[in-house]
Amino acid sequence: MSIRRKALIAAMALVAVAALWFATIVPGQNSTAAVQRTNDGKPNLNGIWQAVTTANWDIEAHQAEPGPRPEIMGAWGAQPGGLGIVEGGAIPYKPEALERKRQNLKNRMVTKVTNDPSRFDSGDPELQCYRPGVPRANYMPFPFQIFQGREQILMIYEYKASIRQVYVDPHLEAPVDSWMGWSNGSWDGDTLVVDVKGFNGHTWFDRAGNFATDALHIVERWTPRGRDHLMYEATIEDPNVYTRPWKISFPLYRRLEPNVQLLEFNCVPFVEELMYTPLGLYNPPDRPSR
């Protein structure tokens, strides 16, 4: 048998194996038999989860680009490319809101530091260590942990130890607006549905300047697709910013390393010089105050 014929047979065998693989494992296929369950029969969402996406840089499709201050940051500050998580490709901005988004991108590294605690008209809130809000907390490059109960579900995010309390029974109204909003949950079969309102209007969705106001309303759907991964979907509406509701979706994966746990990421000390030097309130820790 010639070498060329052997190579052809090997290639055909490889194609057959690949075809069998893709025929049996379809992306998004619901494998409910493998879903872990709690004592009351609900899907067991307990554990540490993390997204594998570049959405924190930009939730829309984007190419790799240099980041802010490339003369200092080089490749460290570069933006990786990504296919985006917005269904349909583009966010349906109103014209004036799209212009604000463009200004946000232009000014993402600007910090207008003042003594007025009610002002947040500056760059990306992540740059200044503010809480990320929803849905951004779910796709930042940090893990988060879910503690599931019948009446409440607790979500703790490694980034700044941000917390969400999902009220399943009974539902409660938000007492005040906040960075992470107010979450009420219910079960639709095996899907956890979380209705989120009560935002303070200061959060961004990513480093590209995509944003919403305090009229933001989000409906999340957390659906198990197997033993160790979920499909996350969120319908987003804000009549101040968008012409219609729109959706994002991406998978979440359970972290399975031995002794996996959330570690501390307290970013406040990392931004003290950035935030307080313009006010004359910062003294480096290795230099005595004057």
What are the residue ranges of the model-derived segments?
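PEST-like low-complexity, intrinsically disordered acidic/proline/serine-rich tracts
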Residues: 2-290
